[in-house]
């Protein structure tokens, strides 16, 4: 009986979505702050900055993308760390 109960508890824990979802800011530089939940398994946030004729442009989101030279990229691993 105890074994059956333990098995049910383990199966319940495994089947429930107990995974944590990272939250990252995703607003462009000129917009009000917004954030979103990242896809499951995505544990990083990024802040990407570059300059063009409009000035400094900032892009934020989930993940840690590859960037070209001349683009400043900061990646971090906590909620809303990419502001």
Swiss-Prot record:
Protein name: Short neurotoxin B
Keywords attached to this entry: Acetylcholine receptor inhibiting toxin, Disulfide bond, Ion channel impairing toxin, Neurotoxin, Postsynaptic neurotoxin, Secreted, Signal, Toxin
Secretion signal span: 1-21
PROSITE patterns: SNAKE_TOXIN
SS bonds (residue pairs): 24-45, 38-62, 64-75, 76-81
Keyword Protein transport: no
GO cellular component: extracellular region
Tissue/organ expression: Expressed by the venom gland.
Function: Binds to muscle nicotinic acetylcholine receptor (nAChR) and inhibit acetylcholine from binding to the receptor, thereby impairing neuromuscular transmission.
Family as reported in the entry's similarity comment: Belongs to the three-finger toxin family. Short-chain subfamily. Type I alpha-neurotoxin sub-subfamily.
Record lineage: Eukaryota, Metazoa, Chordata, Craniata, Vertebrata
Main location (coarse class): secreted
Pfam families associated with the record: Toxin_cobra-type (PF21947)
Alphabetized GO MF terms: acetylcholine receptor inhibitor activity; ion channel regulator activity; toxin activity
Signal among keywords: yes
Subcellular location: Secreted
UniProt organism field: Laticauda laticaudata
Coiled coil: none
